[in-house]
């Protein structure tokens, strides 16, 4: 293609020359009237392909009459461009009297080939063409006062694009690369095409095949892992000619469109097959990748991903805007995976780009005008596998969004984030007559920095329907129109009363964000009936525009949210992650955004569970709060089930009757913020005594723990409390200010005992301490009675261990042990009945929840620390009560019931100690301390300033000269350098941190270290560079290096290095190897060779072979004695390979640093300043003549790169006597020439065309 285009351009120029000669012989009579006449071209725009040559014609005629010498025609070529709404002429070249001057930026690309022989032919030869060369060109000819000009339009066709196979990166052989370009309506690009695209700013860090079987890629801005052809400089990097079977990507070149590409955006997006069919119905076909790039090149701008013929999804961007293609124009690709590989699945739904041949090419502005502003981007996240569920009573059918696969868009500043989440599935057995359980929609926490574990977003539990019961779905559909990115609306179906929001993924520590939206009983769990095993979930994060949707119609989703629901089927107790009617409190930590979904459906009547195992104790949440940085207190962890808070005053507990929820009585969509708790009744075993569950809002989360809010809390939801901050310093707390109250109830509930100290205003507090002990109570089995008034058996011990090990044994299955937590706590009082006051404590409680009996009723088995069973009452309830003064919990409900209050039998009187807590969580190695109420006295003593009268520094416990410093009863040692430890008893090695710079050797001594510096370095740490390198050379560890990009054979390269007082580089350490390899990114010669003795490799600078870095199975002497020289292979991190010495490659020279000795002495002169022994390269010294002598010539000399000084030019002489100077001053015999003859030549006035020479070289 290149040779043909050059010949065509040459023939065009020849034809133009013949044309002008004929025109000059047959001039019109009107032409003779003017001295200058421009032969204007009447044809249309000139089209030429990228990287080719083009001739822009410019002819004029001259009247053959005599004219002054100054009337020589002046020719000027300019490019007309528009800037700020005004036309500007960009100079290209000027020519006059066979002198041509080319403007900067056009040198080497433009010429006037016919002008030297035919001064009336100013045809401009331009090339190799770039895409930016398209535009309007002006040829202007000026002769005297006559001025003629002509305009020529140039259109550069063709575009270079990178193509990656669908299956993976670097997956194409050379033959496959050619075929891929052919299927994309293009050809494989030539090196000149890629070079032209690079010169226009094309940057792509993917190696791809070119037509000459080389592999290259263009880099306009070097960055780690993506370098140009030279170190940290832009260029097209080449791997050279490669084996055709090697695998790379490919660069394609599309030349002409030959039709039109148009965008198809139906109301409902299409699968790949649907997109093909839709284009065929419109008399077109899916556009190819090359056709879309050509359409983009011609002005197509559409911020909507669409299917193409090869199964990829792309969209063209002309005007970059926020969340629409990144910061630069181009064709963006939507990849399936986050590493920019894979095409979307054929079943995914997008719009389409169709191509219709032999139609008018769309002009700029024909496409749909994109809307401006902060518009959304298309985000897709793959959700959990969707089990085949049938809609339950009161449920609605929810249609999944159109996107079916996770998608990541390439080339964007704000990438389409993707997080794949899978949820484990549990199948719960159900017997006839059991309750109909609703699926609870839980929002999980995802992080963009990684892929969460399969269970990180909850547990999928398959719903079951009682046998013989048929539940018909009652779908009530609505169609929501989501405003698109340039005016159109995406169509999405969903339930009327359900708006699903998402947890925002962030690269920062995960933040729990759950949406508190109204979900009435009619808005039940999604019923997904799909043939696929995986049903991804996605939303369109655009502005929500749903007409007629009530108050939710004008809501806008956050900018970049993703959601992936998890389904939970609770057995008898719902998860606290889905608490109705809660809003985050005003005093919650800013790092936690709390919101809860309403339960989608609740039974209208109490139902009796039957043989349903419950994973009640399934998760424990660990949160650590770093506090405010106070040094007085350690970081305290919170081991809790639900996050329950304490009240410092007495309040009331609401006694709410069961609330049957039905479609006629939906929950309110909003709850006042002061109503922190809303009780919800569920059906229990006894229809007459439904158990009551009250769920509390989550508490404040940790700001410093990466694990905060990353573990879901399930199955613990029968305590009721609200949190109130406790003001005042820690030392003023007493037991009356810390209160925990379980809710007394006749029904079986799952409870916790929680102790929280929340001290946000304390100047000495380092956070908050929470100690939660998980206990459980169950209703008696049928046929058994329980005396609720019976007295409990007192059990007490002090300073013992509380072990909470949730263990669930499923009927007929293996025991599951999801979490264990062990904690040492102070004694706790436990009442074995549900109505009496606390009177004693248990020493150690090992809680095991198992399925007991035929009916699978879970029982609680507390055991003592000695292993004996303390209490095992499957027919009773076990309620944990604190030993603090009683108080009640608060709720702003209308119906309230007073909880009896009283004083405990005894108060804690254990000595105040800090008891360590070991958290048995795999995700955390945090060791913290919990507090006992007895800490009050300890901190009061500290606050009062009491201390041991004995001075701890009296005997100076610090060793090795350390200084003892006291702080009350505590002391600390300030150690001298080289020592560490509590008493400065550890002699540390100062050289472990490598303090010596520039390759210096560190030697550890008794009280410090010393550095042995390499030559040319000095200072205590070898930080001073005492010797330098010549210009263009780089210094590293005492030597100077220089990379030469021009190619030579090995012997010629060594000879060139020796001319520069060096050798081909030698390598003696990994650090030096890394430094040398950073110069160029092509294979380069080094000084290693075995030319003298086979297999005996030596360096040319005669240094020893101390370090080797050969490629695998090298050296191999492949050419049987012809591989005697060594090259650094660039694409293998500079590993060595022996090759024939006649290869022409770049090379690196190495030489020592250079210094000059004392400057040479000059007669009758001395140096200015202090005389030194050594001088760096390029140093300059000045001489001054002694007193009584006059200076002649230059007084300075310079130290050259060869270590030698310039020859001094200064001459100091004594002045002659004045009378002798006067005697020889006048020479009467010498005849002076007339002044006229000494006059300089008259300077010619500057021509007007020379005024533009400031723009030219």
Swiss-Prot record:
GO CC annotations on file: extracellular space; GABA-ergic synapse; glutamatergic synapse; perineuronal net; perisynaptic extracellular matrix; plasma membrane; synapse
Keywords: Calcium, Cell adhesion, Disulfide bond, EGF-like domain, Glycoprotein, Hyaluronic acid, Immunoglobulin domain, Lectin, Proteoglycan, Repeat, Secreted, Signal, Sushi
Subcellular location: Secreted
Tissue: Early postnatal and adult brain; not expressed in kidney, lung, liver and muscle.
Domain Sushi, residue spans: 1154-1214
Residue span, Link domain: 159-254, 258-356
Stretches for region Disordered: 361-391, 447-493, 550-610, 683-707, 1215-1257
Disulphide bond pairs: 58-139, 181-252, 205-226, 279-354, 303-324, 953-964, 958-973, 975-984, 991-1002, 996-1011, 1013-1022, 1029-1040, 1057-1149, 1125-1141, 1156-1199, 1185-1212
UniProt feature, compositional bias: Low complexity: 447-459, 569-580
Function as written in the Swiss-Prot or TrEMBL entry: May modulate neuronal adhesion and neurite growth during development by binding to neural cell adhesion molecules (NG-CAM and N-CAM). Chondroitin sulfate proteoglycan; binds to hyaluronic acid.
Protein name (database record): Neurocan core protein
